[in-house]
Design a protein with these regions (language model features):
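Charge-rich, well-structured scaffold segments of protease-associated domains
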Residues: 1-39, 113-262
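A generic structural signal for short, non-catalytic loop/turn and secondary-structure boundary residues
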Residues: 4, 48-51, 61-63, 105-109, ...
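Structural beta-strand/beta-sheet cores of well-ordered domains, especially the beta-sheet scaffolds
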Residues: 7-9, 54, 66-70, 81-83, ...
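Alpha-helical scaffold segments in soluble metabolic enzymes
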Residues: 24-25, 87-90, 103, 147
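His/Glu-based metal-binding/catalytic segments typifying zinc-dependent metallopeptidases
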Residues: 38-99, 258-262
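Generic secondary-structure boundary/loop-capping signal
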Residues: 55, 88-89, 101, 107-109, ...
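A structural supersecondary motif
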Residues: 69-73, 93-135
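Short, structured coil/loop segments at alpha-helix boundaries
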Residues: 78-81, 104-107, 193-196
């Protein structure tokens, strides 16, 4: 606790009191040092890069449903690419209209739930990461992996969906307003990403210019051909590990006791 007090902190207040009065109250109630060290928050923790395709399996005989995750290293985040990230996420994993749900659940009934998207880091320049997921029956794991991997390797193209994607993104951006009490946090978060104006102003402009070729180019540079880590959790007695190994190579088994402490 003593070390924490030696670092700068950020306090957000929403209310009717004047700023100076709020400051005096905080200084009287909190142990705030005058000479503090600069904070490095949010800290970007080092991550082991994904350099080759790998499959990990965490056995759990109690699981009624198997869970399969797909991980791909992304690129350093830049706000100029914000709409491209949003558009790909919507096209590839955007709910029931996205490729993942449509190809895996609607067409083939292989999954209870499925998604795939790039996550945005809190600061510009930090790394993005793609996370895909399929929740399916244990006896359908291999088939579900086959379909998902084919989507990542050779994404189906439906250019006619672009107008609907533009409409969804435009509505999302324009309706994503901070509440009264969260305005200052939103402003700080936007500044951390590198924005100097309201992101919606830039994003609406880029959405209007968005074409399907933008989504395709993003996929080709951020997803296609990149090494993939697959993590499977499920009942080892119901998942055909021999067939999985024959098709995808070595499977590294994980242990709950080593991953999680009691």
């Amino acid at each position: 606790m003593h070390q924490i007090q030696n670092y700068e902190l950020e306090i957000h207040y929403a209310g009717a009191l004047p700023a100076l009065e709020v400051k005096n109250i905080l200084y009287s109630k909190l142990s705030i040092n005058s000479n503090v060290r600069p904070s490095q928050s949010p800290v970007e923790r080092p991550i082991v890069p994904i350099t080759e395709d790998k499959i990990y399996f965490l056995p759990d005989a109690s699981m009624q449903q198997a869970k399969v995750y797909f991980l791909i290293d992304g690129e350093p985040y830049a706000v100029k690419d914000a709409v491209n990230y949003m558009a790909f996420n919507e096209y590839f994993g955007g709910g029931f209209s996205g490729l993942v749900m449509n190809e895996i659940r609607e067409k083939r009934s292989m999954a209870y739930s499925a998604y795939g998207h790039f996550s945005r880091p809190p600061k510009q320049g930090q790394m993005t990461k793609f996370t895909g997921y399929v929740g399916t029956q244990s006896d359908k794991v291999l088939d579900a992996i086959d379909v998902y991997m084919s989507l990542l390797d050779s994404m189906p193209q439906y250019p006619e969906t672009i107008e609907n994607i533009r409409t969804i993104l435009r509505q999302s951006v324009l309706s994503n307003k901070p509440t009264f009490r969260s305005k200052s946090q939103r402003l700080t978060a936007n500044m951390m990403l590198g924005y100097k104006v309201d992101p919606a102003m830039l994003q609406v402009r880029d959405i209007q210019r968005l074409t399907f070729d933008n989504i395709l180019s993003f996929y080709q540079s951020h997803v296609q051909g990149k090494p993939i880590t697959v993590l499977i959790m499920g009942d080892p007695g119901l998942i055909d590990q021999k067939q999985l190994k024959a098709k995808y190579g070595k499977i590294t088994k994980l242990s709950k006791s080593k991953l999680f402490s009691n």
